[in-house]
């Protein structure tokens, strides 16, 4: 009996151990499957994975194309067999395509895994191995439009700033320009590299201002203030009234409209169209600050953004209990609030798309060396930022900006448009940053454009004309 009891306990222990080992095995296999399907590309493509670049010993880095078939980056081989990465457009795509020498940035980093992977047929790979040749890497076909990118680049000129263009219904990034820029071709980059990374260099040529440039939003933030007013007063927000004398005085504070222009009697529609600082500062005093903070975070301030390229997180700090001056400043997009051009483009795209934000993306598909599709990236809905009704109401306000307000640069276009201008103060004694964010056509939006020009002055006078050139190129020139 004692042996039987001991044997029984031993059998139970063996069975328990078997179950533990089996569970561990199943868990390990499950994680292995998850890694292969979900995490492998992320880990392999990590900048910390030193082994990835060893792929270049047997694979010639693939090309990067615009969506209209223009070569944005390719590897050329000279007579001595030396490889050279070439960027035919020079500085035009420097920030979004990036560079692959001196580290990797932009698409050269984001798509590194694909560019160093080859999907040529097996026989060709074997032949390449036996003959000591490299297999051609896969290529990236991007969502970027070369003509639209060139328009943005030329329109911005030699001024500092950024231009972003999105397709609101899909999230495709159509153009992304940041200035000042640099030539990513290795021969040029090597000559200026030390100057670019010098701690005393304050030009920031390597900074992608479209994604990483944090700016006070100025009057384009009135989109957020207006939305909060709509939510708190859904039936009466249009009845808001303010008599603008050009300067709004309260206690020891004063808020000036641009150049102290007196707008006269304003309702919310007119105040938005005319970008009346006094009206929106006064409106901010009537709003629930806790609700306003919640709204800002619903619109992705202080939050991670659904983006694949490196970006800076926008900031909003006003909370319940804030003082009068902070309320006045924050309500008109000043104070400590900061935002990137890409974030404002995403918010505008959600307004243009019925309240739904589509995840911005820049790689359309991966092709092998024969031009055959290996992988395609499809539009993905990120989240709803607002209701369809709210997006429609904001759109109506933005149409008025063009039709009778500060967006007059777009008024006589062959298409309808909607937008918001902004002039953001950032340093005493310096000209304001010029903003514009908007979309066209107003009825069935096809393109969103956001523009920031550092020290450009008024948004209507400086940034809106750049957006006009972008809309013209996309809706008129490209459709011919």
Name what the model sees in each region.
Residues 2-6, 68, 169, 173-219, ...:
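Beta-lactam-recognizing serine transpeptidase/beta-lactamase-like catalytic domain environment
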Residues 1-193, 205, 214, 240, ...:
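Periplasmic/cell-envelope proteins involved in peptidoglycan metabolism and beta-lactam response
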């Amino acid at each position: 009996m004692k042996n039987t009891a001991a044997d029984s306990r031993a059998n139970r222990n063996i069975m328990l151990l078997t179950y533990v080992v089996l569970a561990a095995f199943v868990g390990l296999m499950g994680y292995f499957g998850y890694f292969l399907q979900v995490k492998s590309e992320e880990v392999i493509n990590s900048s910390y994975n030193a082994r990835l670049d060893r792929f270049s010993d047997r694979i010639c880095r693939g090309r990067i194309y615009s969506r209209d078939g223009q070569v944005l980056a390719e590897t050329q081989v000279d007579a001595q067999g030396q490889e050279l990465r070439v960027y035919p457009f020079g500085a035009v795509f420097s920030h979004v395509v990036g560079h692959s020498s001196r580290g990797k940035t932009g698409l050269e980093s984001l798509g590194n895994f694909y560019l160093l992977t080859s999907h040529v047929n097996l026989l060709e790979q074997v032949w390449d191995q036996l003959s000591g040749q490299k297999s051609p890497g896969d290529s990236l076909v991007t969502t970027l439009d070369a003509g639209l990118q060139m328009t943005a680049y030329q329109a911005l000129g030699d001024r500092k700033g950024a231009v972003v263009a999105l397709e609101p219904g899909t999230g495709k990034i159509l153009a992304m320009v940041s200035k000042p820029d640099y030539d990513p071709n290795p021969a040029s980059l090597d000559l200026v590299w030390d100057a670019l990374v010098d701690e005393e260099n304050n030009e920031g040529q390597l900074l992608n201002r479209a994604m990483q440039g944090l700016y006070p939003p100025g009057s384009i933030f009135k989109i957020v203030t207006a939305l909060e007013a709509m939510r708190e007063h859904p039936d009466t927000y249009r009845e808001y009234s303010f008599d603008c004398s050009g300067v709004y005085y309260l206690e020891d504070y004063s808020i000036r409209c641009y150049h102290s222009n007196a707008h006269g009697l304003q309702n919310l529609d007119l105040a938005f169209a005319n970008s009346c600082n006094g009206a929106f500062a006064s409106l901010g005093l009537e709003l629930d600050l806790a609700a306003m903070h919640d709204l800002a975070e619903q619109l992705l301030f202080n939050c991670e953004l659904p983006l694949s390229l490196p970006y800076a997180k926008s900031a909003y700090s006003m909370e319940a209990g804030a003082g009068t001056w902070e309320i006045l400043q924050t309500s008109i997009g000043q104070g400590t609030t900061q935002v990137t051009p890409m974030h404002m483009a995403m918010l505008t795209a959600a307004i243009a798309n019925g309240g739904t934000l589509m995840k911005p993306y820049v790689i359309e598909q991966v092709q092998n060396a024969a031009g055959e599709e290996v992988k395609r990236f499809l539009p993905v809905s990120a989240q709803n930022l607002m209701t369809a009704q709210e997006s429609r109401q904001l759109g109506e306000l933005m149409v008025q900006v063009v039709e009778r307000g500060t967006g007059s640069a777009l008024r006589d276009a062959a298409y309808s448009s909607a937008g918001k201008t902004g002039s953001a103060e950032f340093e005493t004694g310096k000209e304001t940053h010029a903003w514009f964010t908007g979309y066209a056509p107003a009825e069935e939006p096809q393109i969103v454009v956001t523009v920031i020009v550092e020290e450009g002055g008024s948004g209507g006078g400086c940034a809106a004309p750049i957006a006009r050139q972008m809309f013209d190129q996309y809706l008129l020139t490209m459709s011919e």
